[in-house]
């Protein structure tokens, strides 16, 4: 019988056989798992990145970053039990600082992991890898917006490219501090630019681009976007005015009227510049606002004779004549012409004709022949004397002159010590023969003939000067005119040359004393002008007449070899071009020329443009109502060279005005870039008839120099002259021997309105010996068009011993909103002590703000155009030189950037921050390469001396 009892042993063996097919739930529940992984992130300056790791069933967690274990003391641990599952866990966190990343020494990314384990460290679980980045943002934007002024309806793009950063920065645009919301017209481009497809007036404002990431937030400088609207004319109004005329009455009185057209009826019509009106300094409508036409008058008028003119002078045949014209009135509408002769001749009266004409002619011929004979004999004698003087002078050349110490007052300002690199040319009118006893030369006196218009400066090294390279007495130069053989027989006034040997440069041509000739017909320019000259080579130079308000910059490589160039200033009316009645001169005549007789006056020696700077008297702030015109004479007479705002491809000069508000006396200067030697003058007229333009004038009060002069009747002279510098220099020469008691700058004078000078608060002991209010009518002051406008104020002392004088002079203009100018006048030396001995001192400097190598390196970087306009065009806009950009690109042999830097050199004269400001401009443009060039230069030369 079989036993049905199960075999336990066999069952046990069977369970063992199937044990591998069942899970060990207990071991699975106790397995270490990481539930919170450390996350990648950024370290921000002083803010570390916190890495967090959580593991279940673990007893400890450690961190390993870039193959190095983190010290356990830095790890914050938290042990707990999950309230839901009841599973135990450990939470560990650590702060990764910038120092950890910087000191890791790994070239690759900084990576961290956490490791969870039990007590026996047999089961270790690693987390995911977390990468730690250094968050940063560079300072400078790769592309920055630039100020723009565009017409309404045009497309406008403001570029912006964030600085180099990690993580990538987000860009936000602001307008007047408010975030710009994109719409159908305002588009945000993928490169960060802000595009306005059709600019609207409401889009005008200050725009800023902001770049933001976790590390920082940076903004560009605000740039102004100005949307302007050019004006447009409305329709013409109907003709206004009646054409009725009483013909019988007109015929009755026609003979009394010089021109009947003055009384004939006219019709008038107008239009308005409001379709649309100009906005945001948009261009005003071109053309006339008003139109008139003469009425067609049916009246028939017969011609009538005018009165006979005065008798002419008697001719050589003892006859004289007089004329009349058929103009009172002229015949109209088929009227009869005048009958009779319009010319009458008769013999001169007996007392005016005592001999027959043939005898007079014979007598004149005899006189002329005698004079010619005497002139020939005198010339022969003078030639012999000149040869004798030359031989005598040559025998004394071996004995060099010893420089003598002279009192500056006695020397008349001849000797000046200058720092190295500065060479001064003295051009003062000397009445004495200061050095005449020391110099003996056959070329000390010569007579230049009258010549054509072109004026040059003959240096001591030219022919006919008797210059010797071994001569120690210095060089000589004189203003003369180049002449042809056909004019060599003409006469001219004698020019005296004197030389100086003290405190001069090694190059004799840098220090020369000029005596002015008194006959302007010899020079072509008034000899009262101020002038400075220098021998210039390829290194260039700066010539300056500071008190006359004129400067000349000759850049490097502007001339080949060595050339003597000069800068002169004249405010004489006869030197100015002929202006239209509505135009007014706004500057003196500025002359740049060559002192080389071997060159033709029409040959251009310049290889690149030079920059001429001068002061003007136009008032352009707060309202600029002037339309400026630059007149130039390049050898063929005065012509309009530039009408500001109307430049075209034929414009060969560039004119730049300083912006209002510029420091260092920069406002009121005009800079002209020209490729030729020329005479220049700035003129202007109101933009339209309905506007009134104003000038800036200089007020000055002169009085006696000696205190004893105030013990007897005396007078004060109040001058009102243009604020150009040269005008005041002319006043100084006119007031030679007087004393400046008080002066004031930038008084605004309108063309219309009488000028009044009022005396107040005269000190007790003196009385006004005349009217207390002097009024100069507008027809007399003529908008200070004439030189030296002034009035005299007379005073009388009441006491014999009184000499201390003071009063108050108030200057104002009727019908003007300008504030009256109050001038406190006193003769106390400690209050205001200035005399006419302060004269112009021309100076020459060979130093520039930037060396040629630095400018050449900047030119190589900025000449290459790019799409963002952060090239030379962007630099021109930043410097406000972008009114006529084509000028800078019109010279094939010249870099546009170098031309801009030449103009910047002239504009920044006297500014101590010129180079740092240029550095900041390049930085705002987003040109770190150009910034590096200037920073390297500034680090090598930290102290930039402003020329």
Curated annotation (Swiss-Prot):
GO molecular function: netrin receptor activity; protein tyrosine kinase binding
GO cellular component: axonal growth cone; membrane raft; plasma membrane
Phenotype for residue 510 to F: Loss of function and induces a strong decrease in tyrosine phosphorylation
Domain Ig-like: 43-141
Pfam family, one: TSP_1
Annotated glycosylation sites: 206, 305, 308
Residues annotated as domain Death: 857-938
GO biological process, one term: dorsal/ventral axon guidance
InterPro entries: DEATH-like_dom_sf (IPR011029), Death_dom (IPR000488), Ig-like_dom (IPR007110), Ig-like_dom_sf (IPR036179), Ig-like_fold (IPR013783), Ig_sub (IPR003599), Ig_sub2 (IPR003598), TSP1_rpt (IPR000884)
Family membership noted in the UniProt record: Belongs to the unc-5 family.
Quaternary assembly: Interacts (via cytoplasmic domain) with src-1 (via SH2 domain and SH3 domain). Interacts with madd-4. Interacts with unc-129; the interaction is direct.
The protein's name in its UniProt record: Netrin receptor unc-5
Gene expressing this chain: unc-5
